[in-house]
């Protein structure tokens, strides 16, 4: 493994975490949105990011990549709101499955991971610079 590979690995992790942050922002922004389809209103379905190993050719090591962005399988919420025009005959509306607390926790974790990879890049750069000055 070359020391320069660390830039590719940390960089791929930063790109993946950046995309995860975008999905989290989208979930939070759309949590109260509805979609009108086939004559019905449907709540926004939260998205989740699926990571996978992004190996270099002929190598067992590598970075990370987003293999898919999937719909969150958790159930929709039922909220009692009989005055809502979208309520069913029992007075319930179907609401998004976005959990703002979970999204904020995921946001903090993704941001910390991004910051940690920045530190990895800084450390690798520092090591390379020190290596270059050894011969002086």
From Swiss-Prot:
Subcellular location: Bacterial flagellum basal body
The entry's keywords: Bacterial flagellum
InterPro entries assigned to the protein according to its UniProt record, in alphabetical order: Flag_bb_rod_N, Flagellar_basal_body_rod_CS, Flg_bb/hook_C_dom, FlgC
Keyword Nucleus in record: no
Any one Gene Ontology BP term: bacterial-type flagellum-dependent swarming motility
Gene Ontology cellular component annotations, sorted alphabetically: bacterial-type flagellum basal body, rod
NCBIfam families assigned: FlgC
Oligomeric form and interacting partners: The basal body constitutes a major portion of the flagellar organelle and consists of four rings (L,P,S, and M) mounted on a central rod. The rod consists of about 26 subunits of FlgG in the distal portion, and FlgB, FlgC and FlgF are thought to build up the proximal portion of the rod with about 6 subunits each.
Family: Belongs to the flagella basal body rod proteins family.
Protein name: Flagellar basal-body rod protein FlgC
Organism: Buchnera aphidicola subsp. Acyrthosiphon pisum (strain APS) (Acyrthosiphon pisum symbiotic bacterium)
The gene coding this protein: flgC
């Amino acid at each position: 493994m070359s020391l320069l590979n660390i830039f590719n690995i940390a960089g791929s992790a930063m790109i993946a975490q950046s995309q995860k942050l975008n999905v989290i922002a989208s979930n939070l922004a759309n949590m109260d949105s509805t979609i009108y389809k086939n004559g019905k209103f449907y709540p926004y379905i939260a998205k989740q990011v699926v990571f996978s190993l992004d190996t270099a050719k002929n190598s067992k090591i590598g970075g990370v990549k987003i293999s898919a962005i999937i719909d969150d399988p958790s159930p929709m919420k039922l909220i009692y709101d009989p005055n809502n025009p979208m309520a069913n005959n029992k007075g319930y509306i179907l609401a998004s499955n976005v959990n703002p607390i979970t999204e904020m926790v995921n946001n903090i974790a993704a941001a910390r991971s991004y910051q940690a990879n920045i530190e990895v890049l800084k450390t690798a750069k520092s090591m390379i610079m020190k290596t270059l000055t050894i011969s002086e």
